Amino acid sequence: MIRISIDVMGGDYGPEATIAGAARVTEYLPNIYFLFYGLEETVKPVLKKYPCLASISCFCPTESYTRMDEKPSQALRNGRGKSSMWHAIEAVKNGEADVCISAGNTGALMAMSYFCLKMMAEAERPGIAGIWPTLRSESIVLDIGATIGASANQLVDFAVMGAGMFRALYHTEKPSVGLLNVGVEEVKGLYAIKKAGMILREVQLEGLEYKGFVEGNDIGKGTVDVVVTEGFSGNIALKTAEGTARQIGEILNSAMRSSFFSSLGYFLSRGAFRTLKHKMDPDRVNGGVLLGLNGIVIKSHGSANADGFASAIRIGYTMVHNGLLKKITADLRRFHQNKQTLFYKEDKATENEKII
């Protein structure tokens, strides 16, 4: 049984989307159980609309919820032990749930998750990993906005965690990994990026294949399975891609309605356009995963509808089913052991050269 705690109050649509999304996944996800957290007067009327959830869920009323405009520090101070978001995260900490999902305030979710679950011993900093539609299939990009800036060691941790997530979702034994940079040449880029590349080249790990630097246009091409960057660049890349997709959609829609022959062309090509729409639909890959914590937390888009929230649930379910946390913990531990051994040998070799 996979247990999923949900902050029902999060997002633009609240319970109307979160509970409806939970009801939809019952059609294709077996052995699932939900813990719903929210305000009783708001949630119970919506729950009554979905009798399919009655036997596979429980409702846990809370005193408050986290508003979308609250600062992380304010949300943590006001919501600790009270809000629906806090209780949903705490359920993972207490072993009552396997994964927490919220469409609420991103900063508040990061702060509460960090404070409640704490970091993995092997990881320095959490990162948000997003699933990115590409020409090949899907890639994972992280960090897409958890924090600003990253050291070489933190970028390396992101690479290891992202590869573990890719294996958990897509059953690829050795995902390819690239570092986002301003060019593919090894001499280009910030020191932290070049240092991270050097570490990934030198320290071998069975769970990933390092392919070197990649550029922004490689993300959409699907050049690698996992693209690693720091949160500032990652968030800009994400928002740029989302805006470009909407722009293309609006341009196509306008062009198809511009004349009779354009409309006829659209009618004849509607199957291809449906495929394009499905491929680029953000709801299909909705859900940013907070990696590096002692528990799985997923941030759904605040604007996600029921289908989008169902996708976030499906992602969380799949990662729990395939043992994401165990994979990441083992990979990080093995990687850092290999790194210590390698650089210890290099230091010894340097000392011997000095003696000679």
From Swiss-Prot:
Q: Name one GO molecular function term.
A: phosphate:acyl-[acyl carrier protein] acyltransferase activity
Q: Which positions form S-S bridges?
A: none
- The record's EC number reads 2.3.1.274
In terms of InterPro entries, this protein maps to:
FA_synthesis, Phospholipid_synth_PlsX-like
- A Pfam family that this protein carries is FA_synthesis
Provide one Gene Ontology cellular component: cytoplasm
Q: The organism sits in which domain of life?
A: Bacteria
Catalytic activity, as annotated: a fatty acyl-[ACP] + phosphate = an acyl phosphate + holo-[ACP]
Whether Signal counts among this entry's keywords is: no
Q: Which UniProt keywords apply?
A: Cytoplasm, Lipid biosynthesis, Lipid metabolism, Phospholipid biosynthesis, Phospholipid metabolism, Transferase
Instruction: Tell me the pathway.
Output: Lipid metabolism; phospholipid metabolism
- A biological process (GO) annotation for this entry? phospholipid biosynthetic process
The cellular location(s) given in this protein's UniProt record come to:
Cytoplasm
Q: Does the keyword RNA-binding apply?
A: no
- The primary site where this protein sits is cytoplasm
Q: Which family does it belong to?
A: Belongs to the PlsX family.
Q: How does it assemble?
A: Homodimer. Probably interacts with PlsY.
Q: What does this protein do?
A: Catalyzes the reversible formation of acyl-phosphate (acyl-PO(4)) from acyl-[acyl-carrier-protein] (acyl-ACP). This enzyme utilizes acyl-ACP as fatty acyl donor, but not acyl-CoA.
NCBIfam families, alphabetized: plsX (TIGR00182)
| Name recorded for this polypeptide | Phosphate acyltransferase
Question: Which species is listed as the source?
Answer: Bartonella henselae (strain ATCC 49882 / DSM 28221 / CCUG 30454 / Houston 1)
